[in-house]
């Protein structure tokens, strides 16, 4: 670790407790995060892990050195959802013979992956060290890196897989401690199965490693051997085996951190662990498992049927949410204002609050250079399980000092914010195109001023200060004075450019 700061502590889903982070090799800290399945544009729920683990990547780079952290985030470009999207979007072309299904699939995945890259760049995320695509790791490779077919063969040879009905499946009963991540006991799953189990499965929890493709579906020539007898199945890999192969290809059989959304704990991450441990004969796949919480939109589960399905592209490039486009930095801060393990209620109000805060920070930071500041305060907050809310409180305090004219605080504000991936633009870039006066709703400002006065009379000073900060972030300066006739506190306001 680069200095004398306290140790990094992370909540490990595997053990259900906070643990001090001790890398296997401080000279090469290794992290794998599940990336997108590129059949549709990434939504706001997908944005959360991208941003959260970007912050962790930035922190690890600062602690161990930029060249000593390897971050792998995959792209899943083989999946039945992709096949279905290709048929939906290019069905007429396929029927008319203008495109093959494989060509249509390639168009879907290339278009969607390109949009994903544009989205995450706008969110201020650093590029991962490696971004492998699943289709590049299906069959044995000339460079000797791990691949899916070889991993499946190893599982067969070690007695963890069987063939049935055109599929190769993982035998969960062959792994005594299957379910350790999700805390689901195999016996309970077998006893509690309430849906019909595929008759070709030995156990309800068994899952597909390789499945047969029809003549029309994409597929690879999978060549396997069972007890000396060859078995050739033209097919495609199961979802879980993809991440086991790609993580091993770049990070080895055991690595430091595996991350993703809470929804991936079971079955995806559980099954990754099963495959990897049984194939490699290791006690763990990764030492630390981190999961971000769920995202709701305006208090409801996000769903197209609810009409609240919001993509990152919608927010950045259309006026579908709140009647306007939103800067990526606003979206980033709105997500970081909630601790990564807590549920996040994404709302118009949260975006407005985040933008007001950023306006306030950019107003005071001026042309300060982050290289001249000290980012230690935010680093200390992040060392406690990526405590971004505490880190943002640090930035509020620095903004207050900077507003009083402290040049050192301006540089520190910039340096600390950059560690979170914020304040990465110049002041002019941020405010270009913003018509501050035109954006002011005078009635709304008067309402907030009146609310603040009520809070002051009730001696609720923290909430009153919060409103002042909110308005200040929008370029509105409050000036308190006494009414000369009644002696009561009054407030006037003006817009400061």
UniProtKB/Swiss-Prot annotation:
It holds the Pfam family tRNA-synt_1e. It is found in: Cytoplasm. One of its GO terms (cellular component) is cytosol. One of its GO terms (molecular function) is cysteine-tRNA ligase activity. It catalyses: tRNA(Cys) + L-cysteine + ATP = L-cysteinyl-tRNA(Cys) + AMP + diphosphate. Residues 480-497 have a biased composition (Basic and acidic residues). Monomer. This is Cysteine--tRNA ligase.
